[in-house]
Amino acid sequence: MVQKYESPVRIYKYPFELVMAAYERRFPTCPQMPIVLDCEIIDDAETDNGAKRETKRRCKLAVDAPYLFKKIIGIDVAYFIQTNFLDLKTRTLNIEAINETFSSRIEIFEKCRYYAHPENPDWTCFDQVATLDIKNFFGFEHSMEKMGMKQYSQTTQKGKEIIEYFINELKKEGISHVDRWKEDETTEPAATATTTVSISSEKPPLTRDNSILDADYIATYLGQLSPLQESKLVQFRKKIEETNHEGKVPDYQTLLRFLRARDFSIEKAASMLQESLQWREEHRIDDILGEYKTPVVVEKYFPGGWHHHDKDGRPLYILRLGNMDVKGLLKSVGEDELLKLTLHICEEGLKLMKEATKLFGKPIWNWCLLVDLDGLSMRHLWRPGVKALLRIIETVEKNYPETMGRVLIVRAPRVFPVLWTIVSAFIDENTRSKFLFFGGPDCLHIEDGLEHYIPTEKIPSFLGGSCITMIHEGGLIPKHLYKSESVEEHNGVPHGHEHHGLYKSVDLKPGQMFELVIKNTDPKSVLTWDIDVLKNDILFALYRTDKDLEQSFNDSFSSVFDNADMKEGVHYTRLEEKVRCKPKEGVQGSHEMATAGTYVLQWMCPPSCDGPAQLMYFHEILSSANYKGSMTSLQSGFSSNSLQSR
């Protein structure tokens, strides 16, 4: 397989002629490049009245490889042929180099170019491309590829430093300017004075059209990259340009994020990015910042918002998840609207990262998320809510990779391991490594507390800091804000709601009951339930017995405990007192099944009701292996998240 290296544009803030004088000082050897043992000129010719010069050198390089490897291949040095094409009239130097040693087994080709900056004639640009094709190398092809590209990237990294070094040496000798070439005495001389140009208030050179990558841009907007990473980024850009003929090509920050997400595999990153670009076009994501209208319910009850920056300059988003009425939000705005809200936040994050880069004068290419879990309970594990969360996570992971720099989880209660077990499997491993957890109520006055990550004066007051936030506290959403839809219109079954197939519907006549028998063989597992009452009152209770009971489908006016040999307190125990659930009311709860046995969920329509009752229920058992007994028991919880209709 051919390995390719392609550099970004390097810029020397010196005229081309001075850079050429420094370049010549490299030969035949220089201490900054010890791998080059000698360079012998084998041909040197000038043409066009001295404007053009072609120089051919035979370069002797030390083989930087393990001793045993050098013994196997039988050489300590390698020879390369380098040909330079200098054109002083056009102010360009083109360099080509090929290997002479092992040329039948290995093909190494390098092409470099020095040229006058197209926008500032007193600056000089440099770029290079190299390929390595190992055909047959004693069975060491893969090792040779890795070693060759590693060594090549190390030497190219020194190239700019060497030119800068020799320019400084020239200055010490009193040479700070070299005249431009001129054709004859009658030709008007070109300007020779060195011009100092400030670009502090401009965009980086050569990037105004967002197509050419230069070193200054990398330092300002992308951060430190290895030569191979820079090369991958340049190649990735070209690949996207070739495959995305009609659409615009994303900026380098976006390209780099997708490359990082796929461990700098160009093919994998390209596939991921193309799918994301298609998704953005289909859902008009580029217009979301200008077109999105925040629903009234979100404005009043969504407990999240942007809040200054963390200590590294990242935009900080705070989400008070423990105060979020997940069920209420889903019923009032729907899953699609919650996803759209999340995408709007992500797009805001991209914009704020660019603003932070300019504000702090350094690359900011991700943001920080602080999640306050105070108030988190089993009601947050409502399965449709978790399902919506997983959909949101999946969408964000696919389309906004590497935007999360750090996630601070504060005031995590004992129930949090349950949610984390469910959710973490859907989060990229690299993203999971950025999570920091603070379990106690005080996340400030502890070792490695929040003050290590957020400026003291910006820590929110609800976490013990002094900064007042504009973030809503959340709370339960009134049921009159839920989307209206008549249950009766659809024969009592919620029509087309997003949880169809997950919940089961039960109709009960006055005095009738429904019992769900659960045989538990997993001590310390957790039984969770969610109930929505559609019509009339319902009585709910939870029981446990050691007896092996079977699900009854016959006389629904009697209980499985009505046998003569079953006595409450002796043969079975009531774990949850009877709770009266009102119409359009939701009940969520859970119980740790500490021991094996039979558990019975019971719903009953009181005999005093003047008509039949209807409910929908869902239950789930969370394995003890995942839950790990982090809580002794959780009580049923009421919410006004009533089922006005689904």
Swiss-Prot record:
Domain PRELI/MSF1 span(s) in chain numbering: 2-175
Disulfide bond positions: none
Keywords for this protein: Mitochondrion
Coiled coil region boundaries: none
Positions of the GOLD domain: 499-646
Primary location group: mitochondrion
Domain named CRAL-TRIO: residues: 294-471
Keyword Methyltransferase attached: no
Locations listed in the record: Mitochondrion
Gene Ontology annotations for the cellular component aspect, listed alphabetically: mitochondrion
Protein name, UniProt field: Protein real-time
Species of the source: Aedes aegypti (Yellowfever mosquito)
Gene designation: retm
